[in-house]
Amino acid sequence: MSSVNQSLFLLLRIALNHSTEECDALRNLSVVDWQRLYELSKRQGLAAIVFDGISAVMVRLNDKSLGMPRQLKLRWLSLLDSIENKYDHQYKVVQKLAQIVTSQNMPSVLFKGVTLSLLYPVPNHRQCGDIDIYALGGRGDSLDKAIVDAGGKLLDVSPKHSELTLGDVMIEGHRYFVQRYFSKRAKWLDNRLVECANNSDTFIEGTKLYAPNVQFDTLFVIYHAANHFKFEGISLRHIVDWCFVVQRANCNISEVAQLGLEHFSAVLCRIGRDCLGFDFPDSICQCDEPTYQRVLNDILGSDLNKSDENVSFFTLLKRKYERFSSRRWVYKLLGDTYWGGIVNSVVAHLVHPLSIFKGSK
């Protein structure tokens, strides 16, 4: 493993409160190494958290620079400020949603981003994307209308979810938690998630906005990561999310086997234990060495920030084909088949034809 990758994991272990190990080696990083560390942290969706680790090391060693170029430190601080501001703005929109669903007596579950951030040592340092919300009782259309009446804009509606904006923040109003028409497994999962959602925890006290219980997150987070891993790859942020969920569940994740994802989970848990310092037992980290190394290398070498927006239709098709064909090896790990994946993809595009024009963002 390169010195930059080793430094990344060291800083993450420190930031996640898992390490008091020696960190003098960070002073030996070159200017080029620091730049690579910054870019790698961004690609992995963990730039703010890595900087938390850097700040802790600076205090521990009483060294305000560690050899990091001043301009790079300023750029990193600027990115940190941007991440915090985006999170804080998104949280205000979440509070607005809480007011909306409460005034309309429309119990709803917030899931993914903001709710997962509360598992982190510094919640507003976990980068979040869209806001994902599910109106209990199948009231997705009513929730869309309530958001629009409150000043939001409805952009699109697909079988799985609508797309809206409120306060310039993208919101996905879910009809389903997963693409339930993909397979029997997906249908079972969506039904199970609805069952879990009906027993959610309060997110904002005194409102009708709820957060998933641990059973929901145990199933949804690993399935969501597996889908990303299948089609485009995942970042270390997916692994940190999963490890915090496993920690919250006290390592009781046996229901993951119902999804056929116990082997994938074991690889992620081992990365969490060996590289990120999570205290997991061998029983949930058992995987063969070649698979472990291949998954780890795939994650460290991925660039999920590459956008498919504003490219031609044929370029988009070409990229989708290249991604799909290059990831044939992952299907066995995910308890799936390559040809089954092709069928599922075709079904998804038939159900929502315009989705073929949408790429990675």
Label the model's feature ranges.
Residues 1-129, 135-361:
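Conserved NTP-donor binding/palm subdomain of two-metal-ion nucleotidyltransferases/polymerases, i.e.
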